[in-house]
């Protein structure tokens, strides 16, 4: 397994405190976490940074939206890789380790993302009819 310090999880959030707390609790403390909290809730920042030393909460001057939140998080990251995530999507320690290992093996890539394994929840998205069977697929499965 790779060094956990080489990836930062970045969350763009708006009053997603419950989800952020759950992620911080469940992830290895060696992973860095940056939350750009658009609710401007300074109390949340103080509480979570005190409880989880690997977590940094950035509060912009106003609600900047998801895309700019990610950009702010990326600008404040000091690790080799970043993982952009929404607060209500769970990711495991193993998945993050595997993504970093995969990134180290591939070296030349633009975007690397995990596969969603529970397709029964989103069955209407599986087998996308708009993707031709002839479409070349360069998917690296981990």
Where are these regions (language model features)?
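Cell-envelope/extracellular polymer assembly enzymes that use nucleotide-activated donors
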Residues: 6-8, 32
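A conserved acidic beta->alpha catalytic loop
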Residues: 37-45
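Conserved donor NDP-sugar-binding/catalytic core segment of glycosyltransferases
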Residues: 94-126
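Short, well-formed alpha-helical segments that are part of the catalytic scaffolds
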Residues: 13-29
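Short alpha-helix within the catalytic core of nucleotide-sugar-dependent glycosyltransferases
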Residues: 45, 71, 79, 93-104
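Short aromatic/hydrophobic "clamp" motif used to bind/position activated sugar donors
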Residues: 82
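The conserved acidic donor/metal-binding loop of glycosyltransferases
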Residues: 86-90
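Glycine-rich, basic loop-to-helix element that forms the pyrophosphate-binding segment
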Residues: 60-77
């Amino acid at each position: 397994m790779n060094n956990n310090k080489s990836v930062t999880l970045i969350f763009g959030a708006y009053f997603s405190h419950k989800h952020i707390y759950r992620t911080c609790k469940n992830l290895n403390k060696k992973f860095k976490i940056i939350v750009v909290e658009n609710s401007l809730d300074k109390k949340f920042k103080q509480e979570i940074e005190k409880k989880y030393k690997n977590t940094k909460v950035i509060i912009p001057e106003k609600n900047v939206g998801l895309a700019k939140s990610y950009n702010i998080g990326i600008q404040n990251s000091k690790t080799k890789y970043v993982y952009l995530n929404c607060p209500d999507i769970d990711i495991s320690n193993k998945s993050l380790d595997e993504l970093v290992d995969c990134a180290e093996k591939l070296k030349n890539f633009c975007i690397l993302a995990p596969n969603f394994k529970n397709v029964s929840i989103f069955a209407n998205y599986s087998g996308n009819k708009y993707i031709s069977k002839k479409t070349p697929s360069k998917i690296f499965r981990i």
